[in-house]
Amino acid sequence: MSESVHTNTSLWSKGMKAVIVAQFLSAFGDNALLFATLALLKAQFYPEWSQPILQMVFVGAYILFAPFVGQVADSFAKGRVMMFANGLKLLGAASICFGINPFLGYTLVGVGAAAYSPAKYGILGELTTGSKLVKANGLMEASTIAAILLGSVAGGVLADWHVLVALAACALAYGGAVVANIYIPKLAAARPGQSWNLINMTRSFLNACTSLWRNGETRFSLVGTSLFWGAGVTLRFLLVLWVPVALGITDNATPTYLNAMVAIGIVVGAGAAAKLVTLETVSRCMPAGILIGVVVLIFSLQHELLPAYALLMLIGVMGGFFVVPLNALLQERGKKSVGAGNAIAVQNLGENSAMLLMLGIYSLAVMVGIPVVPIGIGFGALFALAITALWIWQRRH
């Protein structure tokens, strides 16, 4: 690993390429592992309402470690933090392969993901700056969504063939991410020498939360991204139950193909946002956020595969255009106030709290027997109303 502490701010520097490759492999493993583990739950006859619980234990790790992972990212070279985090993911995936309870193994992957996220986004502001930061976020999101696209499909297709093969492929992807992390230049720690007293760390994290919440721009970004990712992860589980009801298809692969359409759309939307939206014109993304909810509502009423594909791709386009500028806004403003690692850790707390809440409501709705189509209609309508309210609030403040 290079010991240089100087950044080549080119969008295609060696360090940036290594970050993007590592992110692709890590996100590929995350998404393949989700669908492979869901297939394992089906094979072992777990109840349907337990499926979102799997994701809830994952995001629970994010919430539990939120006060600490931002400081970890800012106290060490971020490339090494990413390597350690991917090592934890590798251990979690391997444990599921060897028959350990899937919820426990997936929790360990969640711990790795919690440590990984502040470092992967925080390092962007160290490898590039200014106007290139939005473009770097576009590359990161495009890499992530390409991994979602391929990882989701690979997880479902391989699981239809053999669940153990799918799980092993996830472990290999995490191993590749660890190797890619080695090639990220060792940059100076952003905030070395901080106290590791847990009480002080928690207090510092709460201060970072307060600081970001009091700033109108970062509060706007936090609420917007939290709503988006909470809705996004809920949609993934909605599709798993919606496909057999609306389309009459019962395999593991079809929900992954539909999720892939969302992923393709987000790549397109992220690219458009990088060209059309700057930090000064972030509000341009808000109509796209409202349209996400409207299109989800329309999608829930479909009974044919081709319209479902098209509508999910449109949801993805709107999603990419919506979330990329909000991420860039938080990184730029947060880096100057609380540090990039802490800013992303606070963002993770918001996003994963939203995921936990939405998944909990969704799991409860399934448990009490509400049909999946009405769940989808209500979900889309509420999301559109929430983004509309956020936009009105942002314009007033």
UniProtKB/Swiss-Prot annotation:
GO cellular component, one term: plasma membrane
Residues exposed to the Cytoplasmic side: 39-52, 112-144, 188-226, 278-280, 326-343, 388-397
Pfam family, one: MFS_1
Keyword Cell inner membrane: yes
Swiss-Prot/TrEMBL keywords: Cell inner membrane, Cell membrane, Lipid transport, Membrane, Transmembrane, Transmembrane helix, Transport
Periplasmic side: 1-17, 74-90, 166, 248-256, 302-304, 365-366
Annotated TM spans: 18-38, 53-73, 91-111, 145-165, 167-187, 227-247, 257-277, 281-301, 305-325, 344-364, 367-387
Gene Ontology MF: a single term: lysophospholipid:sodium symporter activity
Key word Membrane present: yes
Coiled-coil ranges (or none): none
Localization of this protein: Cell inner membrane
PANTHER family, per the entry: MACROLIDE-EFFLUX PROTEIN, MAJOR FACILITATOR SUPERFAMILY (MFS) PROFILE DOMAIN-CONTAINING PROTEIN
Entry similarity comment: Belongs to the major facilitator superfamily. LplT (TC 2.A.1.42) family.
Cited function: Catalyzes the facilitated diffusion of 2-acyl-glycero-3-phosphoethanolamine (2-acyl-GPE) into the cell.
Protein's name according to its UniProt entry: Lysophospholipid transporter LplT
Name of the coding gene: lplT
